[in-house]
Amino acid sequence: MAYNRKETGEFGEKLAAEYLKGMGYSIIQTNCRLPEGEIDIVGQDGEYLVFIEVRTKRRLGYGLPAESVTPRKKAHLMASAESYIQKHRLEHFPCRIDFVSVDLSQPEPRLELIKNALGEE
């Protein structure tokens, strides 16, 4: 099991990618770095190009993983997604931002997918 913050995040992202594949997503890219920020996972779900933010927690004392996405982080996610779309000329694809919540507080990891987490497409 991962111990420090970076390792915990990387572990959660690997779990999330496998989880998403099992849900029918195709993984296009992971850890995509852009001037506006990082996109954890870029994938495709049917016709949708999907930008996925993975939130992993080992303890839930401060709330659920998805609750840790601040308004500032949401703004960075949207800006990063727009930058990715422009950089790769993908304006013709419908897009959305999903969250994957990874809870490592139990013996078995629990994952939850929140589709269209920001409510905009």
Swiss-Prot record:
Pfam families: UPF0102 (PF02021). Disulfide bonds: none annotated. One of its GO terms (molecular function) is nucleic acid binding. It comes from the Bacteria. PANTHER family: UPF0102 PROTEIN YRAN. HAMAP family: UPF0102. Belongs to the UPF0102 family. This is UPF0102 protein DehaBAV1_0707. It comes from Dehalococcoides mccartyi (strain ATCC BAA-2100 / JCM 16839 / KCTC 5957 / BAV1).
